[in-house]
Regions:
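P-loop/Walker A NTP-binding region and its immediately flanking N-terminal helices
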Residues: 1-133, 137, 147, 153, ...
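Conserved C-terminal "switch" segment of AAA+ ATPases
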Residues: 141-168
Length: 168
């Protein structure tokens, strides 16, 4: 079951926005493979290159006013022109003003079935509890260098690619 609001928390560079875009692809992909996006259909390519009309990325650091959120509230009345869902990715959501959070709350309380909100933040403690309680929260952590190196080694072996240990 797909929720209508997600909160991705973690320090910079942990992949919150990247995962949000992959999720947007997964729910809208025309030819999913075992629940994963194909990355080849028109929808997946549009999300990758930023031209998809049904995936809207908003930087709350520069669009933090109540009018910005009210505009979203007006836009969500229209179903997506392509794909099953309209996905709003609101990055640095903790930067919203109190008024903007209140407007967002109204939107999160009764969203249309075809809208998904993904809120991303480095500072979840700055988000009102009323917003937190309406989201499924996921905490992102940095992956250690050793874990990355082990995975790279595994992939090189699987693909029969010879590589020096120093290169990994």
């Amino acid at each position: 079951r797909i929720g209508h609001a997600y909160l991705f928390c973690g320090t910079r560079g942990t992949g919150k926005t990247s995962v949000a875009k992959i999720f947007a692809k997964a729910v809208n992909c025309e030819h999913p493979v075992d629940g994963s996006p194909c990355n080849e259909c028109e929808t997946c390519r549009g999300i990758t290159n930023g031209s998809a009309m049904n995936v809207i990325e908003i930087d709350a650091a520069s669009n933090n006013g109540v009018d910005n959120i009210r505009q979203i509230r007006d836009e969500i009345q229209y179903s997506p022109s392509s794909g099953k869902y309209t996905v709003y990715i609101i990055d640095e959501v903790h930067m919203l003003s109190i008024g903007a959070f209140n407007a967002l709350l109204k939107t999160l309380e009764e969203p249309p079935a075809y809208v998904i909100f993904i809120l991303a933040t480095t500072e979840p403690h700055k988000i009102p509890i009323t917003i937190l309680s309406r989201c499924q929260r996921y905490d992102f952590k940095r992956i250690s260098i050793d874990t990355i190196a082990a995975r790279l080694s595994e992939l090189m072996e699987k693909e029969s690619i010879e590589v020096e240990d120093k290169a990994i």
